[in-house]
Amino acid sequence: MPKEIRWGVAHIFSSPNNTFVHITDITGSETASRVTGGMVVKADHEKPSPYAAMIAAARAAQQAMERGITAIHIKVRAPGGYGPKTPGPGAQAAIRALARSGFIIGRIEDVTPLPHDTIRRPGGRRGRRV
């Protein structure tokens, strides 16, 4: 008898400064695990690295599997808005680590919030005065 497939969603937020891996159930209301790059490395300058993202994703996957999730859809997000529209350096490493950890992979999609016209940066006309 084939084992039952239990779907989850892996929300990967990858900025130039850190990578978050947040695995929820299919509705997104119940968190199975949440790990960041800063939780797995000692030095702050290592937080955005692909290595930190890989370790964070592997740890999140292990915690989610203990809670019974066997298959995941992946949603990748960059800061968007007036920030960078492309994911940071840890996104691809996190996706590869989730695929290697034994999950069945469903869909991979980009959910970066993109403005339809443009967004005015904070700081005003004369800029941020330091």
UniProtKB/Swiss-Prot annotation:
A GO cellular component annotation in the UniProt record: ribonucleoprotein complex
InterPro entries named in the record: Ribosomal_uS11, Ribosomal_uS11_archaeal, Ribosomal_uS11_CS, Ribosomal_uS11_sf
Disulfide bond residue pairs: none
Keyword Lipid metabolism belongs to the record: no
GO-annotated molecular function: rRNA binding; structural constituent of ribosome
Gene Ontology BP annotations: translation
UniProt xrefs under Pfam families: Ribosomal_S11
Keywords, in A-Z order: Ribonucleoprotein, Ribosomal protein, RNA-binding, rRNA-binding
HAMAP family per UniProt: Ribosomal_uS11
Record note on quaternary structure: Part of the 30S ribosomal subunit.
Function: Located on the platform of the 30S subunit.
NCBIfam families linked to this entry: arch_S11P, PRK09607.1
Family statement: Belongs to the universal ribosomal protein uS11 family.
Protein name, as recorded: Small ribosomal subunit protein uS11
